[in-house]
């Protein structure tokens, strides 16, 4: 499957047609397509980020133990974990960064989420969920 697969699909929330840039973002983030009203749909970046924001704000996060630095939890290393800000899939290096810097993974609605390298670089390091998760 290539990025062309997502081109000309509709956003599942706002029903805008996805262009080349949105199609490439869906391909990079491995967004699953759905059928709504007979239309094949994915999600545009604006709707995805708004949905993730609402999920962070409305649902109480639960911290996830990821194992020690010497012995990582095998589930964390093998599971498909997405970024809680942009929806991208965390790479193995990003999962290692979480472990080495003792960053928390959190569970929202039975989904384990973390932070990707890009979102951490753009100033999202001091996440608001940290105060709630340690209590």
Curated annotation (Swiss-Prot):
- Mind telling me what this protein is named? Protein E6
Subunit relationships: Forms homodimers. Interacts with ubiquitin-protein ligase UBE3A/E6-AP; this interaction stimulates UBE3A ubiquitin activity. Interacts with host BAK1.
Keyword rRNA-binding found: no
Which stretches does the record call unnamed zinc fingers?
11-47, 83-119
Q: Can you name a GO cellular component term?
A: host cell nucleus
**Family recorded in the similarity comment:** Belongs to the papillomaviridae E6 protein family.
Please give the function described in this protein's UniProt entry.
Plays a major role in the induction and maintenance of cellular transformation. E6 associates with host UBE3A/E6-AP ubiquitin-protein ligase and modulates its activity. Protects host keratinocytes from apoptosis by mediating the degradation of host BAK1. May also inhibit host immune response.
Q: Which Pfam families match?
A: E6
Subcellular location(s): the record lists: Host cytoplasm; Host nucleus
Q: Tell me which UniProt keywords the record has, alphabetically.
A: Activator, DNA-binding, Early protein, Host cytoplasm, Host nucleus, Host-virus interaction, Inhibition of host innate immune response by virus, Metal-binding, Modulation of host cell apoptosis by virus, Transcription, Transcription regulation, Viral immunoevasion, Zinc, Zinc-finger
Question: Recorded GO terms, molecular function?
Answer: DNA binding; zinc ion binding
Organism of provenance:
Odocoileus virginianus papillomavirus 1
Instruction: List the gene name.
Output: E6
Quick check: keyword Membrane in the entry? no
Please give the superkingdom of this protein's source: Viruses
Which terms under GO biological process does the entry name?
Answer: DNA-templated transcription; regulation of DNA-templated transcription; symbiont-mediated perturbation of host apoptosis; symbiont-mediated perturbation of host ubiquitin-like protein modification; symbiont-mediated suppression of host innate immune response; symbiont-mediated suppression of host type I interferon-mediated signaling pathway
């Amino acid at each position: 499957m290539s990025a062309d697969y997502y081109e000309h699909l509709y956003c599942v929330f706002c029903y805008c047609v996805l262009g080349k840039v949105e199609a490439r973002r869906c391909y990079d983030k491995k967004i699953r397509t759905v059928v709504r009203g007979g239309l094949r749909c994915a999600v545009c970046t604006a709707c995805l980020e708004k949905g993730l924001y609402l999920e962070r704000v409305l649902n109480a996060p639960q911290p996830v133990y990821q194992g020690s630095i010497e012995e990582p939890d095998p589930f964390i290393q093998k599971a498909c974990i997405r970024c809680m800000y942009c929806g991208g899939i965390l790479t193995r290096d990003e999962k290692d960064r979480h472990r080495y810097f003792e960053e928390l993974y959190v569970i929202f609605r039975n989904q384990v989420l973390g932070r990707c390298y890009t979102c951490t670089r753009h100033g999202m390091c001091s996440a608001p969920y940290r105060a709630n998760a340690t209590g």
